[in-house]
Amino acid sequence: MSKEEFPHEKDLKDEVTPDKAPKKDPKAAPKEEVKENPVENYEKEIAELTAKNKDLEDKYLRSEAEIQNMQARYAKERAQLIKYESQSLAKEVLPAMDNLERALAVKADDEAAKQLQKGVQMTLDSLVKSMKDQGITEIKAEGETFDPSLHQAVQTVAAENDERKDRVVKVLQKGYQYKDRTLRPAMVVVAQ
């Protein structure tokens, strides 16, 4: 016999022989194959998907509501901006109006000063009309009951009688309102 006819030793090591075969434990219970019911699997999957669908639908509805709320807030803010668009300009013009009123308070002695005062009065009247056209009005103060949202008490004086308590007795600087907002409170003297 030639060498090729006999199997190599390494080939023999891999062969399974009766003495090398895995031994079965006679006491071990036979393996039971667990067969799952396919209907139960589908029912579980349907229940999981239904719950997930409800969760996603809830998230969608919440997102939709949030978008609607954002749109409503945006519309409200925009309406506020449009409503009060002249507010900053009015605040800038008020000191100029105060200066014109101070100029008119000075007594004019000669004819040239009186003519100048007339021009200042016309300018002030024009500004006041423009302010009223935009919804800016003077806050009524003298003789009114003190209101901290409209008046700023700069000084207090003793009341002459009980009727005048908490009443504005003198206006030091006019206050103005723009629609329903106070642009500048009136600086007043209040009786206590």
From Swiss-Prot:
SS bond partners: none
Keyword Cytoplasm set for record: yes
Annotated signal sequence range: none
CC per GO annotation: cytoplasm
PROSITE patterns named among the record's database cross-references: GRPE
SUPFAM superfamilies, alphabetized: Coiled-coil domain of nucleotide exchange factor GrpE (SSF58014), Head domain of nucleotide exchange factor GrpE (SSF51064)
Compartments, record wording: Cytoplasm
Keyword field: Chaperone, Cytoplasm, Stress response
Region described as Disordered: 1-41
Biological-process GO terms, alphabetical: protein folding
Top-level taxon of origin: Bacteria
Classification via Pfam families: GrpE
CDD domains the UniProt entry points to: GrpE
Entry GO MF terms: adenyl-nucleotide exchange factor activity; protein homodimerization activity; protein-folding chaperone binding; unfolded protein binding
Keyword Chaperone: yes
NCBIfam families, per the entry: PRK14140.1, PRK14162.1
HAMAP family, alphabetized: GrpE
Family: Belongs to the GrpE family.
Task of the protein: Participates actively in the response to hyperosmotic and heat shock by preventing the aggregation of stress-denatured proteins, in association with DnaK and GrpE. It is the nucleotide exchange factor for DnaK and may function as a thermosensor. Unfolded proteins bind initially to DnaJ; upon interaction with the DnaJ-bound protein, DnaK hydrolyzes its bound ATP, resulting in the formation of a stable complex. GrpE releases ADP from DnaK; ATP binding to DnaK triggers the release of the substrate protein, thus completing the reaction cycle.
PANTHER family: GRPE PROTEIN, GRPE PROTEIN HOMOLOG, MITOCHONDRIAL
Subunit structure: Homodimer.
Protein name per its UniProtKB record: Protein GrpE
Biological source species: Lactobacillus johnsonii (strain CNCM I-12250 / La1 / NCC 533)
